[in-house]
C-alpha cells in the first residue's frame, strides 16, 4: 500500500541524493535543499521528515502530506521550511497544505508560511519567493 510506496520512495531518494553528493565530491556539499510543487512538494516534505540524509531547507508550493508510516525521525530539526499555498487551490485545498505545515511546526521546525489567493499553480511570484528563501 501507501506505506510500501513511501518506503520505496525514501530508498530511491536516498540513492539519488547520495549520487549527487558523490558527483560533487570535490566540493564540500553540506547544505542539501529540496523544493517541489504539488506532489513534488509532498515528496520533498516526506523526505525531509523521514529520509536519512540531512536536509538544510525545503520549500513546498501547493503541497500536502500523504498518509505517513509509523517510524519517523526525531522532531525539532533545524531544517528551514517554506510553505506557500493558495486559498483558491481546487486540487490541494488550503486546509491540507496548512495541515502539512502545521505538522512540521508542531515538531519544532522553523517554518515560514505564505498564504496567497492563487489556485493550483506555480507563479512568477512563487519563484521569486523561492529564490529569496534559498538565498537567505
Regions found by a protein language model. Name each.
Residues 1-27:
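Serine-hydrolase catalytic machinery in alpha/beta-hydrolase-like enzymes
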Amino acid at each position: 500500500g501507501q506505506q510500501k510506496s513511501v518506503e520505496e520512495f525514501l530508498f530511491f531518494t536516498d540513492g539519488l541524493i547520495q549520487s549527487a553528493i558523490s558527483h560533487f565530491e570535490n566540493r564540500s556539499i553540506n547544505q542539501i535543499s529540496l523544493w517541489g510543487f504539488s506532489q513534488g512538494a509532498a515528496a520533498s516534505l516526506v523526505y525531509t521528515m523521514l529520509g536519512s540524509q540531512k536536509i538544510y531547507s525545503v520549500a513546498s508550493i501547493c503541497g500536502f502530506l500523504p498518509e505517513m508510516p509509523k517510524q519517523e525521525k526525531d522532531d525539532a530539526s533545524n531544517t528551514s521550511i517554506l510553505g506557500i499555498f493558495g486559498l483558491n487551490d481546487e486540487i490541494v485545498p488550503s486546509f491540507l497544505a496548512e495541515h502539512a505545515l502545521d505538522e512540521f511546526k508542531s515538531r519544532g521546525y522553523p517554518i515560514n508560511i505564505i498564504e496567497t489567493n492563487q489556485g493550483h499553480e506555480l507563479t512568477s511570484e512563487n519563484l521569486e519567493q523561492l529564490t529569496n528563501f534559498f538565498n537567505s
